[in-house]
Amino acid sequence: RKFYMSEFDKYIVQGEPDKKAKANAWQTAIGLQDVDGLKTSEYLIKTAVQHIEGDITISQVKDMLDDYYQVRGNREDIEKERTDEADKVSARITEMLLEKTFSFTPDFLLRIHQRLFEGIYKHAGAYRTVNISKKEWVLGGDTVMYSSYDMLRETLEYDFELEKRVDYNALNVDLAIKQICKFISGIWQIHPFREGNTRTTAVFTMKYLQTFGFTVNNDVFKDNSWYFRNALVRANYKNLPKGIHSTSDYLELFFRNLILGEKNVLSNRSMLVFESQSANKEVSKCQNGSLDCSLDELAVLRFLKENPDAKQTDIAKHIGKSERTIKRITPSLIERGLLERENGKRNGRWVVKCDI
């Protein structure tokens, strides 16, 4: 693990934008394999570095991995450790994270699953056809109640339709994060696939958050993918006879770190149900105070903090909104004291007046 971190960190710290984006994607993709306790090979790291350097394409990476595992001996060890799965899925996640594509539909969720697990799971890209239960470490061996297999599509479509109706412009950041947690934990609880649900949900989440116009801190996924899974479990588990209620508090800490760059402690042990039956006592308080702005407004503030000389057209292009929308957002931020324009319109600079 330290090997790949040090190999990729130099590109993230010193690299060109293209190399930095690739290195970030690789780190995130590899970190996500922790969800199922999988470890990648050193061969993958060396191949990933070639891709980051621009020597080979991501398609070539995938072909090289296929060839590598096709000719490699000791098949039993490979299957036991599932190293081939970790390597191949890491490459496929990297490919998807670097693509500028997204569709807010249940079919896109299926497409992610198919692309990640084709040739690895028999039912890649297909809804499960049986009901399932899974013993969870964080629940002391108990299981979450997942959706019934014969209602998967209908339940997903219902959740997506509800989310489409949410007006995020009307929500401040705190409420927006609560809503995102509600939606993401809901589609995870449906558990539409036999295997690979959490990694699929994670990729969908990162792609979805990109549509809000800011670059999320994918390091949070890279370093805390098992926490992400356990937080989803706790958001969907209750046992009233034992005084245990479902809580999204842990997931909200994760998303506050992811979206706002906060440094809340993400502890798996704190989520163990038998450690404490009162979730409210367990959860660390968020470090930052509330910021009274929407996710779009936060995206603008973040961009202007890094690019104080940016023009309205630059802002619009970066966050994926129309120039008309930006011309509505910036005066509102100025009026509320969150943003300031120094030295006039023509030669002025933006000054962000809040801590973000």
Per-range role (PLM):
Residues 1-356:
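FIC/Doc superfamily catalytic core
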